[in-house]
Design a protein with these regions (language model features):
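Catalytic machinery of carbohydrate-active enzymes
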Residues: 1-364
Length: 364
């Protein structure tokens, strides 16, 4: 019987280090990342350390039991010698020790792992794998979390079966309390409400230019027709328009066109934590393909997302099994949000509400 190869003691020790994930993504990207974090946490039986960026990441992940240490940096593109944050990150990585690592960005930031002394064969890099065109991001993350870095073959526990192909968010108790106060201040306590999120950062940046040049712009008159239909179907529900401060003017233009009562423009009126608590409680959400739509679906809110040019299967809100519909249209044979009619949105929203009454396990 052949003897087993001698194992380097350093590699054996490194296999015991908590798993590390690096993903510096937008709001929705970080929501979807929770699928991988859940997969790895269950696989290793311990929380996962995370390197990320963006002011939304802390409130999104701070209550996740799958997350251990969260290290947020402002930028990966700043030259290393100019970034105190990057120096601190590298120092922390060296102190924690190298271990199984999953890199989930396009390329920026990989050099920071190298500076910290993490060997290439300790890393599963998402760019090194081929993905099926029918995969959602949740499917990809489940598969990525089942892979083992080359150096640790035979040393790590296998992936656990049965991890849902859906993002998961937990809301901090403080955010729930903040929501109660927020609702009370606006005399919305006990009310049901539908959330509409028509804007995106791409639209907001084009305030002085034609918005039709951005892939996520859907005309104000279309949104107004949808809002009117929502009011007819849900006469007793409040309608809340969410968004950032720069998206507030777009919201206001739609609200003026719709001319229906009991509509609130709450753009820039919500912290990330309070927004999550609001989404969890909402009757439903109608949105462009944007981060809050992923969060709403992950929180169990029936979510209809209007897609521009992004792949609707890959970026399906919240993953594979959430209560969501990714709606697309075509113009001259090409996928375009401008090919979606208000009637299609209303019909899809009504279908979604009927589907959402079935158990989540039955939703595909």
């Amino acid at each position: 019987m052949a003897a087993k190869p001698q194992l380097r003691p350093s590699t054996a020790r490194a296999a015991e280090v908590r798993p590390l994930v690096m993903r510096c993504g937008a709001f929705g990207d970080m929501v979807l990342l929770t699928v991988l974090l859940q997969q790895l946490s269950l696989r290793f039986g311990k929380p996962v350390d995370v390197i990320s960026s963006g002011p939304w990441t802390q409130p999104l992940l701070e209550s996740e039991s799958a997350v251990g240490r969260l290290f947020v940096i402002r930028s990966r593109r700043t030259p290393y010698w100019l970034s105190l944050q990057q120096h601190r990150l590298v120092a922390w990585l060296r102190e924690r020790g190298s271990g199984p690592t999953w890199f989930c960005d396009r390329g920026e930031g990989r050099g920071l792992l190298s500076r910290a002394g993490i060997p290439d064969d300790y890393i599963c890099d998402t760019n090194a794998y081929t993905w099926a065109p029918t995969d959602t991001f949740a499917d990809r993350y489940l598969r990525l979390g089942s892979y083992t870095p080359k150096a640790f073959e035979g040393l790590l526990p296998p992936a656990k079966p049965g991890v849902p192909a859906a993002a998961r968010l937990n809301i901090a108790p403080a955010a729930l309390r903040e929501l109660e106060m927020w609702l009370a201040e606006r005399q919305l306590t006990g009310r049901q409400f539908v959330i509409v999120h028509p804007g995106s950062r791409h639209i907001a940046r084009r305030w002085l230019r034609p918005r039709s040049g951005t892939s996520k712009y859907w005309p104000e008159e279309n949104w107004a027709k949808v809002v009117t239909a929502v009011r007819d179907v849900c006469p007793d529900h409040a309608i809340l328009f969410s968004g950032t401060r720069s998206e507030g003017r777009f919201n206001a233009a739609i609200i003026r066109r719709a001319g229906v009562p009991d509509v609130y423009n709450v753009a820039d009126d919500l912290s990330v934590g309070t927004l999550l608590a609001l989404l969890q409680r909402a009757h439903s959400m109608i949105s462009v393909d944007t981060g809050p739509a992923h969060a709403a679906a992950a929180l169990g809110c029936p979510t209809l997302a209007l897609f521009g040019t992004a792949p609707p299967i890959l970026y399906r809100p919240g993953g594979t099994t959430t209560p969501a519909i990714a709606l697309t249209g075509t113009v001259e044979g090409r996928q375009s949000i401008l090919g979606i009619t208000p009637e299609a949105v209303i019909d899809a929203w009504l279908d979604l509400l009927n589907t959402a009454r079935t158990p989540l396990s039955d939703i595909s």
